[in-house]
From Swiss-Prot:
Keywords: Activator, DNA-binding, Early protein, Transcription, Transcription regulation. The keyword Transcription applies. Residues 371-389, 567-582 have a biased composition (Low complexity). Belongs to the herpesviridae TAF50 family. It comes from Alcelaphine herpesvirus 1 (strain C500). Transcription activation. InterPro entries: Herpes_TAF50. The keyword DNA-binding applies. This is Putative transcription activator BRLF1 homolog. The gene is 50. Pfam families: Herpes_TAF50.
Length: 619
């Protein structure tokens, strides 16, 4: 039929459409590009839209175009920060989300348009690393938002906490897929952030947001530093201009292992494998400068002006990389004298209760410290100078007092102890089990001299006239006859300790081994005698004194130089019929009876075996 139809036969086939590089770009509409940003004006939206359009057209660019586009993006980021200033305490939160959204758009366009014959923009090459930077900030700050509130007794609104948890879940989930396209996750995260701002604004209008919560939000979400983001970009642009680098060179940062290893069980719990935030990767050793105790930001919550001025997250008072003058600095060489606290009332970031002072001028400054509730006063004793010398943090939410003590090295600390002097008890860090952390608690007897060393410890610990017990450990001392005095089984006890000549260095713990000894060599092994039992939450009802550490006990048994071993044995009359050397038999048989500790029984059997095989002859 087509042959009989001349009009149909005369038609030519349609010409083929020649597809070029820029015609293949799928341009996104303005709502997709602009509507996901938070609190931007129409003029700023037009500027962002023009930058995105220029990014599409210059994806295959020259060196000059790349440098010019980097400067344009830098100006756009500064304008975004300027527009978000009216958010006050939520300024940093909104700025992080907007900048994350901007570079996520750059990355999404770069993934869609992959050119192989031209050089890409530097912002396109670095977009993945910049997204990683802002995404880690969101995860770190939201984690810190949940962690620091119970540490400072701050009650967060339930509605706001739910929406913040949704945002944290979205950020953690998308952090696992950083190598893939980020367009879908970008919109979900921005919607979750908008929901957080909507709930916070409604609660603030209803008067349910206290001034402490406002200051807390300003502290947790600091304003990002744009100079820190663009400084490596500008540096690379200068190297490209000088011929030292090319646009095809990618920005490579130091590799960091932040996600749990992939194993055969990963497919069963893939959604639980989250990127670990920075706040949970900090060191917790008391002797390091990166130590987190129980962070106290009560001073910042009372004064919101200081949080607004602090725009750098690495310079905050609770940052792990900064040390207060009150915290002793690590010494490069041996110093025989302990470091005493400074005279100024500057506190470390882990302390809330200041040490008591005998000066009348400093008592007036302690009035702003919040008082403990009545429930805590019935359980805890009155804090003395000795316990306040340690950095103390009071948690009204759990009615506990956690101690973060800056310990010196064991050698330096043991060198200041005189075993022949009086005894003084000191409290050591208490457990904080309600926050997911557990630290051993020790209350022990430390002998000090009556003159120089005692004065030295008074300056450092505040007198040392009272023995204090915290947690599930008790402390006491021994009199001249070796009888334990001052032992307690209560959970929180405090009683004065009189100065007596101590013949035993004793401490207590959850597992009661045999009795202790008074050898001066045990003091050098001072800290090694403290076992660590993480996660123990049971409080025993009875305690028995602990034996010294295993190396110290073996030295006594093998060297025969300890006074304790010499008191337990005496020479027996020689066997005239055999003519052998004099044998040593125990004098106090009641001391050789089987104890409740298997380790002590085994040590005694080893000692008896060596004594029977190779008896020692003494004059």
């Amino acid at each position: 039929m087509s042959a009989n139809n001349p009009s149909c036969a005369s038609r030519d086939p349609p010409p083929k459409k020649v597809r070029t590089f820029f015609s293949s770009i799928r341009r996104l509409s303005r709502p997709i590009c602009i509507d996901d940003f938070i609190d931007i004006t129409a003029d700023l939206g037009d500027t962002i839209g023009a930058a995105l359009k220029s990014f599409q057209q210059n994806n295959a660019c020259t060196q000059e175009q790349s440098e010019q586009f980097t400067r344009e993006v830098y100006d756009v980021c500064k304008n975004i920060l300027q527009e978000n200033k009216f958010r006050n305490e939520m300024f940093g939160f909104v700025a992080d989300m907007n900048l994350l959204n901007l570079f996520a758009l750059f990355r999404s366009y770069k993934q869609r348009v992959r050119t192989h014959f031209g050089k890409q923009l530097l912002c396109a090459t670095a977009s993945s690393q910049i997204i990683r930077f802002f995404l880690e900030r969101v995860i770190r700050h939201t984690d810190k938002w949940f962690l620091l509130a119970p540490c400072n007794g701050l009650i967060l609104p339930q509605e706001l906490a739910k929406e913040m948890y949704v945002l944290l879940s979205e950020a953690r989930g998308k952090a696992l897929n950083q190598g893939r396209m980020f367009s879908g996750g970008r919109q979900n995260m921005m919607n979750a952030a908008k929901k957080v701002l909507t709930v916070y604004s409604s609660l603030r209008d209803d008067g349910e947001i206290s001034p402490e919560v406002k200051a807390y939000m300003a502290y947790i979400f600091p304003v990002p530093d744009i100079e820190q983001v663009f400084q490596p970009l500008f540096k690379l642009e200068q190297e490209i201009r000088k011929g030292k680098a090319t646009l095809t060179q990618s920005l490579l940062f130091a590799p960091r292992k932040r996600c749990p290893n992939k194993t055969v069980f990963s497919q069963y719990g893939a959604r639980q494998r989250y990127v670990l935030p920075e706040v949970l990767l900090e060191a917790s050793e008391p002797q390091s400068t990166l130590a987190y105790g129980c962070p106290d930001i009560s001073s910042l919550l009372r004064d919101s002006s200081s949080t607004q001025e602090n725009t750098d997250e690495e310079s905050g008072p609770c940052c792990s990389k900064t040390l207060s003058p009150g915290v002793p600095q690590p010494q490069s060489e041996y110093d025989p004298s302990p470091t005493s606290p400074p005279d100024s009332d500057t506190e470390s970031c882990d302390s809330q209760v200041r040490p008591e002072s005998t000066d009348s001028d400093t008592h007036a400054e302690d009035d702003d410290v919040p008082e403990a509730p009545q429930a805590a006063s019935q359980t805890q004793p009155t804090t003395t100078q000795e316990t306040q010398s340690c950095c103390s943090v009071y948690n009204p939410a759990t009615t506990q007092t956690g101690f973060y003590y800056n310990q010196q090295s064991s050698d330096n600390f043991a060198s200041r102890i005189d075993a022949s002097a009086t005894s003084t008890s000191y409290g050591y860090p208490g457990p904080v089990t309600n926050h997911g952390f557990s630290t051993s608690v020790f209350s022990h007897t430390v002998p000090t001299t009556a003159t120089g060393q005692q004065q030295l410890h008074q300056n450092m610990y505040g007198g040392g006239q009272q023995t204090t017990t915290y947690g599930s450990y008790v402390g006491g001392y021994s009199d001249a006859n070796g009888q334990s005095v001052g032992a307690s089984t209560s959970y929180y006890t405090s009683k004065p300790a009189t100065s007596r000549s101590s013949t035993a260095l004793q401490w207590t713990t959850l597992f009661p081994p045999a009795s202790s000894s008074a050898s001066s060599s045990q003091v050098s092994d001072y800290f090694s005698g403290f076992p660590y039992f993480p996660g123990s939450s049971t409080v025993p009802q009875a305690f028995e004194p602990l034996a010294p550490s295993t190396p110290s006990l073996l030295d006594e048994l093998l060297d025969r130089d300890s006074g304790l071993v010499s008191q337990q044995q005496a020479p027996a009359p020689p066997q005239n019929d055999q003519g052998g050397p004099p044998q040593y038999v125990p004098v106090a048989q009641e001391q050789q009876q089987s104890s409740t500790d298997p380790l002590s029984d085994e040590m005694r059997r080893i000692f008896e075996f060596f004594d029977s095989v190779n008896p020692v002859t003494r004059p």
